[in-house]
């Protein structure tokens, strides 16, 4: 990332397996607790892959501080079309360097955040499970302020004629 306050997306792809209607889910929720140094930037969506159809309406999206939840609606969970698909959950975020301390090395410094999300599904028969995504690292390297090829010139002022002279 080129700027320590840049916006970017966290995306999570997950497969929902084919299920017989007797084993449909009673609940299915993707949850991401954003790490310190990252703030929600006001956009979350869900796409079905590979078609990239927007299926955001199949989920109730809520935020509470740094926690973003995608809860599948009961209407979606009761449809055969929900199962046997791959979904991509998208969360637009922004780096917030005021929440983390950079790591300094030589003439540069680096902001780094690590994140992972979970998916928890429960079948109508009560069996439930939670899976975690791999951890992803996002970073931004910046360089310490340098003044290159600077020179100092001395100026004097003659108060009577109001002119600055080198």
Residue locations for each model-derived region?
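A surface/secretory-pathway sequence property marking extracellular, secreted
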Residues: 25-72
């Amino acid at each position: 990332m080129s700027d320590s306050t840049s916006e970017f997306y966290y995306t999570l792809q997950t497969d929902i397996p084919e299920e017989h209607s007797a084993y449909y889910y009673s609940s299915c929720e993707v949850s991401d607790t954003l790490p310190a140094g990252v703030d929600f930037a006001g956009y979350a969506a869900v796409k079905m892959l590979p078609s990239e159809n927007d299926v955001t309406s199949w989920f109730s999206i809520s935020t509470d501080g740094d926690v973003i939840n995608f809860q599948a609606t009961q209407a979606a969970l009761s449809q055969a079309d929900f199962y046997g698909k791959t979904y991509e959950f998208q969360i637009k975020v922004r780096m917030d360097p005021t929440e983390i301390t950079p790591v300094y090395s030589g003439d540069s410094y680096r902001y780094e955040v690590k994140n992972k999300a979970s998916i928890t599904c429960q079948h109508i028969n009560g069996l439930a499970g939670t899976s975690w995504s791999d951890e992803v690292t996002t970073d931004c390297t910046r360089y310490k302020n340098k003044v290159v090829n600077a020179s100092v010139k001395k100026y004097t002022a003659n108060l009577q004629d109001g002119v600055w002279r080198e």
